[in-house]
Amino acid sequence: MDLLVAHGGDPAGSNMARYLAEGMEPDGKIWHGRHFDLVIIDSPAISADWIGGEYEYDGYVFLSRHGAESGKLALTCHSTGNFAEAQFGGSDREVAIPYPGFQRRYMRRLSERREKFNGFDITIEATHHGPTGLDKPSIFVEVGTTEKQWNDKGLCGAVAELVRETAEEQDEKTPFVICVGGTHYPEKFTDVLLKGEYALGTVVPKRALVNLDDKMFSHILERNAGAAAVLVDEGGLGPEKRRILNMLEGSGLEVISA
């Protein structure tokens, strides 16, 4: 069973959580359901490395707002981790265990209902921010991109309903890949997730490749145990391309071009 987590100070997360809490059984700080439980926490979700020690579940789904300087409307879903210094939660040079099956089921459901979300980009993001220390899979589901959307109870409720449906659906155990290259909003990897045969694990963007050395990649492999391959956006590797490809080819995993 998964635990859905929202920060009480996050308007989008709180609105999604309140929608989901209807019909669930309150028990102290926890709401119990048939297929998942829910908790609203007092501290930011990006700093919730502690939550696995207090609430033991099979996986953790964080309900959150999404922000961007561009203000472009987006509904996003991403794994967490820091490839260098931890500036927004988690630990330095640590990535979380991703939740590929949940992300794939949620994003495909979101894409199928995209007519309900006119004007919104439906996209994954590269792996970023915390928490990073949980010993079970985790994923962020986010509503963006301004206070207007975060406080839109109808929008947040519609997204939360898709989260509910996803949590109630059995994981089909789709093979997943580690992704390397591309931008923060990697279109090629999103297309693979929505239309291809793979789910996605950790996504390392081009801007982080300068920090991707053998030690960091070994850690990523450990946190993505069972990955079927490494999916590479070769056009999105920048000046690190040859070094990165040589390192990936020595990993023992198949390297596939996106």
UniProtKB/Swiss-Prot annotation:
| Keywords for the protein's UniProt record, in alphabetical order | Hydrolase, Metal-binding, Zinc
What Enzyme Commission number(s) apply to this enzyme? 3.1.1.96
Superkingdom as given in the UniProt entry: Archaea
For this protein, what is any one GO molecular function term? Answer: zinc ion binding
Q: Pfam families under this entry?
A: tRNA_deacylase (PF04414)
- List each coiled-coil range: none
Cofactor binding comment, as recorded: Binds 2 Zn(2+) ions per subunit.
EC supergroup of this enzyme: hydrolase
Q: Which InterPro entries match?
A: Deacylase_DtdA_archaea, DtdA
Q: Which reaction does it catalyse?
A: a D-aminoacyl-tRNA + H2O = a tRNA + a D-alpha-amino acid + H(+); glycyl-tRNA(Ala) + H2O = tRNA(Ala) + glycine + H(+)
Task: Mention one GO biological process in which this protein takes part, according to its record.
Answer: D-amino acid catabolic process
Name the coenzymes or cofactors required. Zn(2+)
Q: What does this protein's UniProt record list under function?
A: D-aminoacyl-tRNA deacylase with broad substrate specificity. By recycling D-aminoacyl-tRNA to D-amino acids and free tRNA molecules, this enzyme counteracts the toxicity associated with the formation of D-aminoacyl-tRNA entities in vivo.
Write out the similarity annotation. Belongs to the DtdA deacylase family.
Q: How does it assemble?
A: Monomer.
Q: What is this protein called?
A: D-aminoacyl-tRNA deacylase
